[in-house]
Amino acid sequence: MKFKNAIVNSWNEWDPLKHVIVGRADGCCIPAPEPALDAKVPEDSDMKGQYGPRTKETIDKANQLLDDFVSILEKRDIKVDRPVPIDFNQKISTPDWKAESMFGCMPPRDVILTVGNEMLEATMSYRCRWFEYLNYRPLIKKYYELDPHMKHESAPKPRLSDLDYRKDYLSEKIGIQKRLEWTEKKFFVTTEEEPLFDAADILRFGKDLIVQHGFTTNLKGIDWLRRHYKDHRVHAVNFPGDPYPIHIDATFTPIKPGLIINNPQRKLPKEQRKLFEDNDWKIVDAAQPAHNSPPPLCYSSVWLSMNVLVIDPKTVCVEKSEVYQAEQLDKLGMEVIPIDLRDAYAFGGGLHCSTADVYREGDLEDYFPKQ
């Protein structure tokens, strides 16, 4: 149910967007090695062994692109808020661990999950991101004060002790084949010690929430979400073709009711497609990325080409250089808005990653009645 004069309201990934948070690149750091992070950085990556503050030049460039993105959204009458960056280049600790620095606040989608009138802070699964919610607290506090129906929730903070991670999971050169075997068996770097999830592993389809089980979200995390969202149906999915299964939004992207693009290298398994096929949803292979490799010092894969931001069921923001993805979405009947963001990818992801919904028009609907 949508409340009158609500500040916070968003039930899915495609209803008309009216209010959004866009991240900032200020002070972003490359985090030092830690158990979950080691498993995400490919052995041949130029990020191996590098950590510390990113250069002022790259930060300024990324911030300029994010500011330009904000201007484009505002010209379309979308209200934009920005996080308040804390000092990321400082040591942090809990009774269980110490970390050399934090990460940043470019990708709010990783941290904040908006479902209806509720904004939920995810547990997070990297130690360097444990305090990342603090960047968004000033905004959430403001929404809470202005909107009497808004709910601010925070999932139980995990300890992230060594028990949360498989020791030496990918510390040696194991090879891609072994990694793929492990992910197919759902054998990931994170254990089932306690509930873990990143908000970017969750896609909202009205009454149904689709959650990726992988490196950053475990089964206990999915169970916690199921208990928390009692009025929703929570479905766990996995993508066996992904050797680094982290965050669903460069793998499986809903565009509008009835249409999803799926990474052709990470196909949804046949048995998990039933929910979509039974309800007349079309899953099409996403277009190939325009690039053969990610930008320098970037965690993400070339498939950020799929990391698009849907503004309404007829309009989508696509990264400017991703011409094949833009062409495909154009042929699928969407108006495509090109956004230059590639030089900000390294700070936390693409157009979907760098945003978090505050308000979309529309109410809670059931898009999968047959199940």
Whereabouts are the PLM-identified features?
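The feature marks the mature, well-folded catalytic cores of soluble enzymes
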Residues: 1-371
